[in-house]
């Protein structure tokens, strides 16, 4: 199985290395793709092109948002995804108004395009310290297919357990053979 681990330069997360190690231990083929935030407008299209040759797409934090923006219904695992990066980044002086405008456009397109198949194909993992607005927005757009972790920081053993659950979830979905028949996973 092939995995694409998406990263945004200067927004990397320590969990990315642990996630990579987990999937390497399962003999998954892992490709890491790193983007500059200044290239935000191009990221969804590049990910869409890359999606044809992978089984799972994974992103943490800001990278999780861009994983959600990819419109193909690949299996997606997002950890503490930033659901509205335009709001989070609008307070930073180093982020231009033009970039905020681009992010708002991607947000609108991302959440307007969510359909039943995309809901089932998306699995979210949230830690206790994740922004509650992000959790609520994930639930609103993608349904109940998420796993909450009560810890502020995900220890390796806990991360391993929730990643195992995500793989079990997707194995169950694939076994069903019909993504759209699994409406029980969302509200």
Where are these regions (language model features)?
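Active-site catalytic motif of lipid deacylating hydrolases and related acyltransferases
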Residues: 2-51
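Short, highly selective alpha-helical patches that border small-molecule cofactor pockets
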Residues: 12-20, 67, 135-139
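Gly/Ala-rich beta-loop-alpha elbow adjacent to hydrolase catalytic centers
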Residues: 58-68
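Conserved hydrolase catalytic core segment
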Residues: 69-75
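Residue in the alpha/beta-hydrolase core beta-strand immediately N-terminal to the catalytic nucleophile
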Residues: 55-58, 75-77
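Short hydrophobic segments within beta-strands
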Residues: 4-8, 58, 125-127
């Amino acid at each position: 199985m092939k995995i694409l681990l998406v990263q945004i330069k200067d927004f990397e997360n320590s969990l990315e290395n642990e996630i990579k190690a987990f999937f390497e231990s399962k003999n998954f083929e892992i490709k890491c793709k790193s983007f500059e935030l200044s290239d935000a407008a191009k990221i969804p299209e590049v990910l869409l092109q890359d999606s044809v040759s992978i089984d799972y797409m994974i992103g943490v934090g800001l990278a999780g948002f861009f994983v959600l923006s990819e419109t193909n219904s690949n299996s997606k695992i997002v950890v503490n995804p930033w659901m509205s990066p335009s709001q989070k980044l609008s307070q930073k002086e180093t982020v231009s108004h033009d970039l905020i405008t681009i992010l708002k456009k991607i947000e609108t397109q991302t959440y307007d395009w969510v359909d039943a198949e995309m809901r089932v194909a998306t699995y979210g993992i949230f830690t206790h310290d994740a922004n509650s607005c992000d959790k609520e927005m994930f639930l609103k757009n993608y349904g109940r297919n998420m796993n909450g972790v009560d810890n502020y920081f995900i220890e390796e053993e806990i991360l391993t357990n929730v990643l195992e659950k995500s793989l079990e979830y997707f194995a169950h979905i694939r076994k069903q053979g019909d993504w759209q028949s699994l409406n029980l996973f969302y509200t």
